């Protein structure tokens, strides 16, 4: 049957014509591709005259996303511009031909900031290029930036600020002032989108629907899933197991969630978004300290609901921020808090080290319900790397969850989402979820390609999915795992499964690092350097490299180790080795999933 259908999928070009077309298109910028698509379509139709002035005024919407929010906003902007009959292309920053950025005319960037001031994974190559000596003069570009961030971090929305200042330094003109938005960004985003469309309508020629230019290659695929972040699917927890030992300092759980009937599909490398609920015990403690009962009616999303329900399902309670501390200082007029207001560094440090509950416990005050909700940030879903492949587990999603747990003033505090999943959610109970696709962390298209997987702690999760997929599809490519954790006997996550993969030959090599099993701490980056020559040979043979772990610690150290081993065994200086790794990233041979 496959052979009968195959001819329908073949292009109406000879092999020679197809080669020539691919050769030409590979050298074109996104702007040139957009113009060419309109030109060729017009040549084929012979009926609708194309406005060459309009075709050269293509707007590029660039999405630089880490968790999906920037991508969703970029898609919304793209659809707004299409509706306004403007010529527009939308591109994932990881696919963007950034060395031809000088050919852009109208550039709109929606970017997030990863962790404490890093660019999102898909924008690293673009970011490094713009801040390098190779960056071109950009006098012909008009641009606008929307920066997403989280004010609980020191470098709030830093990458949006960096792109904005650097483009201006290179000669580009601001079309509209940069917008920096916190986690509750939607209202600001709606205003920004309207203003951008209004401005561009006054500057550019509109075209009818048939003349609108589009780019098929490098376009973001607009996925219309039945269930989304805004409209999640109600799944059910079917299995929950602790996979660290009783003596481990870590509490890590393996979860299996049933998504039967949802129609949700995912690939290894994707994440599961989880809408969690806050701890009722924590809510009761907060209400008592603030002199509230929880029965007071409050308005949330245009509905009147009890305050207790609002705190359980709609507001963030476990993460404090500098803005919350500042607002609480003004409400309480407490001298110690007011002293922090003018010292941004101390303010952020206090917020980082003092959860909201502990702040109000030390400095209690009676609040009206509306005052309390004005202080708090909206609850946002947590994303967890999926630890399974649908090719093996079908209508299930597996997660590997580490419980955030610490002590303050003699009391145990836990993370909102991790404690919900590990402690409060019971087997067979409902849980609201959605799939967050991550096209920047994908197995090679060629199943014969070797892969190198580097993870620490729960960073092993996506690699479990990778191996399930490779086994289910009988992929022939070699597989090498580097894994690190604290103790061999306590923290070897999914040990039996890795041993089975070694035994059946699917996993060709495994190197582990147990940081606290000896006097001198050993980490995965140390193992990489020990295996440097063999790793270099794998890379030379075309292997893809994957890293999953903490963005500010493990992932940075691993990248430094990779640059070092490339420099040593590739006989390069540091700058050449760093450029080599950047080229691997651009070619999708070096991919990271960091948190």
From Swiss-Prot:
Binds 1 FAD per subunit. Binds 1 FMN per subunit. FAD binds at residues 318, 352, 382-385, 400-402, 406, 415-418, 595. Its EC number is 1.8.1.2. GO terms for molecular function: flavin adenine dinucleotide binding; FMN binding; sulfite reductase (NADPH) activity. It catalyses: hydrogen sulfide + 3 NADP(+) + 3 H2O = sulfite + 3 NADPH + 4 H(+). Residues 59-197 form the Flavodoxin-like domain. Alpha(8)-beta(8). The alpha component is a flavoprotein, the beta component is a hemoprotein. This is Sulfite reductase [NADPH] flavoprotein alpha-component.
């Amino acid at each position: 049957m496959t052979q009968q259908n195959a001819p329908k999928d073949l292009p109406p070009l000879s092999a020679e014509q197809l080669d020539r077309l691919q050769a030409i298109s590979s050298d074109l910028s996104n702007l040139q591709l957009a113009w060419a698509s309109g030109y060729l379509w017009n040549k084929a139709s012979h009926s609708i005259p194309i406005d060459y002035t309009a075709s050269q005024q293509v707007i590029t919407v660039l999405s630089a996303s880490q968790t999906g929010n920037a991508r969703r906003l970029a898609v919304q902007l793209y659809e707004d511009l299409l509706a306004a009959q403007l010529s527009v292309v939308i591109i994932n920053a990881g696919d963007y031909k950034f060395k031809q950025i000088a050919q852009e005319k109208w550039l709109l960037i929606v970017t997030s900031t990863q962790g404490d001031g890093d660019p999102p994974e898909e924008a690293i190559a673009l970011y490094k290029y713009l801040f390098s000596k190779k960056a071109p003069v950009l006098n012909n570009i008009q641009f606008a930036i929307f920066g997403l961030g989280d004010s609980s971090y020191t470098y709030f929305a830093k990458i949006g600020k960096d792109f904005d200042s650097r483009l201006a330094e290179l000669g580009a003109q601001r079309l509209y002032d940069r917008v920096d938005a916190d986690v509750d960004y939607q209202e600001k985003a709606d205003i920004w989108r309207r203003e951008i469309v209004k401005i561009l309508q006054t500057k550019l020629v509109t075209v009818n629907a048939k003349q609108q230019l589009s780019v098929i290659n490098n376009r973001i695929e607009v996925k219309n899933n039945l269930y989304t972040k805004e409209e999640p699917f109600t799944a059910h927890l079917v299995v929950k197991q602790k996979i660290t030992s009783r003596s481990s300092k870590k509490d890590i759980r393996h979860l299996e969630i049933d998504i039967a009937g949802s129609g949700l599909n995912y690939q290894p490398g994707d994440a599961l978004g989880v809408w969690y609920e806050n701890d009722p015990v924590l809510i009761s403690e907060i209400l008592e300290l603030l002199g509230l009962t929880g029965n007071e009616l409050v308005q949330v999303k245009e509905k009147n609901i009890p305050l207790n329900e609002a705190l359980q399902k709609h507001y963030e309670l476990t993460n404090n921020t500098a803005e919350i501390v500042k607002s609480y200082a003004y409400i309480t007029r407490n001298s110690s808090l007011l002293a922090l207001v003018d010292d941004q560094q101390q303010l952020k440090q206090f917020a980082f080290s003092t959860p909201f509950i502990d702040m109000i416990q030390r400095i209690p005050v009676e609040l009206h319900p509306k005052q309390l909700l004005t202080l708090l940030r909206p609850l946002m879903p947590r994303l967890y790397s999926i630890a399974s492949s649908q090719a093996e587990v079908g209508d299930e999603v597996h997660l590997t969850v580490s419980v955030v747990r610490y002590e303050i003033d003699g009391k145990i505090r836990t993370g909102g989402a991790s404690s919900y999943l590990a402690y409060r959610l019971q087997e067979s109970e409902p849980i609201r979820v959605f799939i967050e696709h991550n096209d920047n962390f994908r197995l090679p298209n060629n199943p014969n390609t070797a892969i190198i997987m580097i993870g620490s702690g729960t960073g092993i999760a996506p690699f479990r999915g990778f191996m399930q997929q490779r086994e289910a599809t009988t992929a022939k490519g070699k597989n090498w795992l580097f894994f690190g954790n604290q103790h061999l006997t306590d923290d070897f996550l999914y040990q039996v499964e890795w041993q089975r993969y070694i035994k059946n030959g699917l996993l060709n090599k495994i190197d582990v690092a147990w940081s606290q099993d000896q006097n001198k701490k050993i980490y995965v980056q140390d193992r990489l350097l020990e295996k440097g020559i063999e790793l270099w040979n794998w890379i030379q043979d075309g292997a893809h490299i994957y890293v999953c772990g903490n963005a500010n610690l493990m992932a940075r150290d691993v990248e430094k180790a990779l640059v070092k081993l490339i420099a040593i065994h590739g006989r390069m200086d540091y700058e050449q080795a760093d450029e080599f790794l950047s080229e691997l990233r651009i070619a999708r041979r070096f991919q990271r999933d960091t948190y």
